[in-house]
C-alpha cells in the first residue's frame, strides 16, 4: 500500500538547492562504502490523518528530495517503485509537476524551479559518477540497493491531540533559536 504525505498550507514550498541535494546523495553513497552501515535521515514528523495518509509536519525537503532521487532511478531502472506520494494543500499543480517534471515549465512557478533544479542536480551527480568510469546502470542499482537496505527514516508521530501548526511552529522556533544563539 502506498503512503500519501500531505503538505499543509503553513509550509513553504520545496527550496533545496544544489548543495543540499548533493550532500544527501553523497551521504547515502559514503555510508554505503562503510559496508552496510545504516544511514539515518533527520526525523520526519507526521500526523496520521487517515489510513496510510499523513500530514507532513517536518521533513518535506528531505522527503521530496528522496522522491526526486527515486524518480531519477526509476527512469534508469523501470522496476523501481516509489512507495509514497506527496500532495499539497495549496499547490496542487506542484503534485502534478513532481509526477512529471517538464523543464520547459521550470520558470512558471517557484516550486517548479526548485524541483527541476534539484532533479538536474541529481542527473548531474549520477552522470559525474559515470564519467569516473563506472557503468550508469550499475551505479543506479547499487545506489537503489543502498537506499532500500540501509537508509532509515526516523519517524516521529505526535499524539493525536497535538495541532500540526503548533508543532511545526515549535519545531521551527527551536531551530531558529539554535541558529540565532550560535551567532
Which positions does each model-derived feature cover?
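Glycine- and hydrophobic-rich flexible loops that cap the catalytic core of alpha/beta enzyme folds
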Residues: 1-183
Amino acid at each position: 500500500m502506498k503512503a500519501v504525505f500531505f503538505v499543509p498550507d503553513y509550509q513553504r514550498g520545496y527550496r533545496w538547492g544544489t548543495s543540499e541535494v548533493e550532500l544527501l546523495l553523497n551521504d547515502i553513497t559514503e555510508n554505503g562504502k562503510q559496508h552496510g552501515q545504516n544511514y539515518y535521515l533527520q526525523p520526519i514528523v507526521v500526523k496520521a490523518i487517515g489510513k496510510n495518509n499523513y500530514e507532513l509536519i517536518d521533513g518535506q525537503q528531505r522527503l521530496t528530495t528522496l522522491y526526486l532521487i527515486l524518480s531519477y532511478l526509476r527512469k534508469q531502472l523501470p522496476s523501481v517503485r516509489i512507495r509514497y506520494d506527496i500532495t499539497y494543500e495549496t499547490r496542487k499543480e506542484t503534485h502534478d509537476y513532481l509526477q512529471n517534471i517538464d523543464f520547459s515549465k521550470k520558470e512558471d512557478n517557484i516550486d517548479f524551479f526548485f524541483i527541476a533544479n534539484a532533479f538536474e542536480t541529481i542527473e548531474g551527480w549520477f552522470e559525474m559518477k559515470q564519467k569516473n568510469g563506472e557503468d550508469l546502470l550499475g551505479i543506479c542499482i547499487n545506489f537503489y540497493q543502498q537506499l532500500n537496505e540501509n537508509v532509515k527514516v526516523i519517524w516521529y508521530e505526535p499524539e493525536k491531540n497535538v495541532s500540526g501548526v503548533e508543532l511545526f511552529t515549535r519545531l521551527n522556533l527551536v531551530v531558529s533559536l539554535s541558529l540565532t544563539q550560535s551567532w
